[in-house]
Amino acid sequence: TLVGPIGSGQVSKLANQIVVGVTIGAVAEAITLCEKAGADPVKLIKALSGGWADSKILQTHGKRMIDKDFTPKGKTSTHLKDMNNILECANSYNTHLPISNLVKEMYKTLVDNGHGNTDHSSLYNEIERINKK
């Protein structure tokens, strides 16, 4: 799909990775909150299915988070690279993306702690780590 002049395809790929990374973070937080409150995250995903919060990420990565299965499909280290590219691109347009920056920092922490080869849904583990403080 043509989205604009030359270079727009690259920016679109970066935009896709913003949505993926931020949504993985949102799903991780939702599952963590449910678990902490004693709610069943499997039932949460079922309840959200078909509504505004439903997405492939909720269904696929949510299940991985619940199952604690972080076998890499999309690596954390690759998503960190993408987030760095996103922020570099944004900076070149004098554009601030604070949510993307937060997601990047969380992926960086995972990579720095030796989890670069896990699936990017392992962002859930960083949310869990933060909540064990």
Model-derived features: where do they sit?
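General beta-strand structural signal in soluble alpha/beta enzymes
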Residues: 1-4, 99
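Helical "substrate-binding/catalytic lid" subdomain
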Residues: 8-126, 130-131
